[in-house]
Amino acid sequence: MPAIEIGRICVKTRGREAGKKCVIVDIIDENFVLVTGPKDVNKVKRRRVNILHLEPTDKKIDINKGASDDEVKKKLEEAGLIEFMKQDVKPKIPVI
């Protein structure tokens, strides 16, 4: 089970959206992925994110590569994960 894969739900650990959950929509290269909230669910915009700034969860939805926000929202509703996505989490950031 790869931790970084399309459809994996992750928690953002850095930036203004830290603590919010997102879904991996596409893998850009070995360092970056494309994620979305979707924005109308938990205010996480579709953007490129460094994988070091993500903490994968054990939850995954079945979406196609490059799925639209509407498709992601529909799959989240089918899986019953809308309320899970709206809950913020305190990210585990190691102290340097």
UniProtKB/Swiss-Prot annotation:
Membrane spanning stretches: none
- Give the record's keywords alphabetically: Ribonucleoprotein, Ribosomal protein
Q: Which Pfam families match?
A: KOW (PF00467)
Q: GO biological process annotations for this chain's record?
A: ribosomal large subunit biogenesis; translation
Gene3D superfamilies assigned: 2.30.30.30
- Matches recorded under InterPro entries: KOW, Rib_uL2_dom2, Ribosomal_eL14, Ribosomal_eL14_arc, Translation_prot_SH3-like_sf
Tell me the SUPFAM superfamilies matching this sequence: Translation proteins SH3-like domain
Which spans of this chain does the record mark as coiled coil?
none
GO MF terms, alphabetically ordered: RNA binding; structural constituent of ribosome
A GO cellular component term found in this entry reads: cytosolic large ribosomal subunit
Which HAMAP family has this protein been placed in? Ribosomal_eL14
Q: Which family does it belong to?
A: Belongs to the eukaryotic ribosomal protein eL14 family.
Q: What protein am I looking at? A: Large ribosomal subunit protein eL14
Protein's organism: Sulfurisphaera tokodaii (strain DSM 16993 / JCM 10545 / NBRC 100140 / 7) (Sulfolobus tokodaii)
